[in-house]
Amino acid sequence: MELDRWAQLGLVFLQLLLISSLPREYTVINEACPGAEWNIMCRECCEYDQIECLCPGKKEVVGYTIPCCRNEDNECDSCLIHPGCTIFENCKSCRNGSWGGTLDDFYVKGFYCAECRAGWYGGDCMRCGQVLRASKGQILLESYPLNAHCEWTIHARPGFIIQLRFGMLSLEFDYMCQYDYVEVRDGDNSDSPIIKRFCGNERPAPIRSTGSSLHVLFHSDGSKNFDGFHAVFEEITACSSSPCFHDGTCLLDTTGSFKCACLAGYTGQRCENLLEERNCSDLGGPVNGYKKITEGPGLLNERHVKIGTVVSFFCNGSYVLSGNEKRTCQQNGEWSGKQPVCMKACREPKISDLVRRRVLSMQVQSRETPLHQLYSTAFSKQKLQDASTKKPALPFGDLPPGYQHLHTQVQYECISPFYRRLGSSRRTCLRTGKWSGRAPSCIPICGKIESTPSPKTQGTRWPWQAAIYRRTSGVHDGGLHKGAWFLVCSGALVNERTVVVAAHCVTELGKATIIKTADLKVVLGKFYRDDDRDEKSIQNLRVSAIILHPNYDPILLDTDIAVLKLLDKARISTRVQPICLATTRDLSTSFQESHITVAGWNILADVRSPGFKNDTLHYGMVRVVDPMLCEEQHEDHGIPVSVTDNMFCASKDPSTPSDICTAETGGIAALSFPGRASPEPRWHLVGLVSWSYDKTCSNGLSTAFTKVLPFKDWIERNMK
């Protein structure tokens, strides 16, 4: 007992300490306040008087609330100020009762109304809207407060759509329906496509969704109240309303849409049209052509064809169809398209990518004959004008792509100044359906350079000079490692895909064994000996085939000539152009007295030499040496040689300065003289450096060249 007393005294002491620690106006907790929710609102003057609450517009007491605190003027505040006594205007009936022995939930839990008007729910009757999943039902909103917002989402079963009918509509009217309104959307949310927005009191027509859901939104603004609205909904199918006329069968598809299967004699989306027995009159064939039924049911009789018949048209000989190739007999008894005609025309000739064509504007051509001159002298000018020959009319009608009208002229030119045209520059479409003249083509201009070379001119570029590189198969004495490329010879470009070179450059030493094409490449547009100084404009081309002359002798180096076929076409430019091939008629008997230009790179140059970086393509003049004299020169040096008919010897011309040593550079030999294609001088390939025993470049021994002229036909056969 003593222990219990001391415990109670301890609790009282603790309570006094807690009270002394609170702020002044909250120092006393009024235990009479009904629950902790009220304590924060209660002052020391908290009263127990009951405050009566009334429903809006009514005088009878419908509820009470306590306590109510006094304000600064020591007056009891109105119950409407405190949220515990605010009763929503739309309550259908308010909760009755007084503060009794038990705690009423009138204020504390927020339940103010016992019953709400239809469509509203919640303790304050302010909540509305819901998700509806039913085959049928209703949406009823009895009256509505200010600033209300309600949403309903109606879901139907898959394969069904929703029909919504308004039984009553009483909202504030506005032409734009922007104050109080009901908005219906075709979907399940407020972002779905809107069907329509309604206001006022005029009931709308029934509304149908396209899918299985419908969204209904109600909104009211801050003024005026009306009676609300009432709508019923039900699940239906697109066929529920029997949309097909004349006993047509309504068929549903997977999307919920419908199609009507019409009975015989009816047509239309809903079988609403009576199908008349129609047909099309027979189409005649075009002049200089004929027709053929290619699809559909075909002829009804000799003069008519059935609906759905397709007729195709064709032309005879050199005539071309202008207009629709096919026409179809349509449901209305009319033919599709327009009747075509057969016209004389020419198919455009095929041209290469190097040829540019231009169709000239249509002009009717006429010719003056002796008869015209006779009339001009025998008759007066007036009579001549009256009796003048009428010029034919210009052709009409569109032609298929790739055809041109009669008398059309087409002009041709090469796409680049580095090419020259062969064939006609202008061709005319004749009445026979053929083109006048010869088909044009463009070939590269050969043997032309920007400036005439001279031994005194430094830096002359020879655009047909081809550098032949070979890939190493082992360690080279010069420090080249396996797989590195090194310059072995010079060749001559003779067309976009062909290079002529000495055969010993592309075979194993002393053998007729051809090296692999993968171990060979051709570089065009090269000028400097050092590969690092080459311009970006050079072209590195792969080799697709190596054609060795069948009579090549690897011991005597007789017939020392080969053709390289390029895998990729050379791009013709100022730096890359072919050289011409000379004919027997071009080379006169004065060939022995000719001054021949030889060009090539120093293939034996030392890469460590100070001048290697600036070393360029060398060239110089040589003169032809008599074959017997050439053999005697070598015999005097103890070197027996044979100069065959496929060779010629030449040595440096002492009368002209030169920087070339043919024994070190190899290279190609060329002559400049007017060719058959142009009176201007053109450079022609006449020889390839084959062999030389002049180790010191002292000109004591002549260099042997392979003659190109005897192999011209063989080269041209392999150029194709």
UniProtKB/Swiss-Prot annotation:
Residues 445-720 form the Peptidase S1 domain. The keyword Acetylation does not apply. Belongs to the peptidase S1 family. Predominantly expressed in normal skeletal muscle and brain. Expression is enhanced in the regenerating area of injured skeletal muscle in mice. Residues 128-236 form the CUB domain. It is found in: Secreted. Disulfide bonds join C128-C150, C177-C199, C239-C250, C244-C260, C262-C271, C280-C329, C315-C342, C414-C442, C489-C505, C630-C649, C661-C697. This is Inactive serine protease PAMR1. PROSITE patterns: CUB, EGF_1, EGF_2, EGF_3, SUSHI, TRYPSIN_DOM. Induction: Down-regulated in dystrophin-mutant mdx muscle cell line. It comes from Mus musculus. Residues 1-21 form the signal peptide. Residues 235-272 form the EGF-like domain. Glycans are attached at N614. One of its GO terms (cellular component) is extracellular region. Residues 278-344, 387-444 form the Sushi domain. The lineage of its organism: Eukaryota, Metazoa, Chordata, Craniata, Vertebrata. Keywords: Disulfide bond, EGF-like domain, Glycoprotein, Repeat, Secreted, Serine protease homolog, Signal, Sushi.
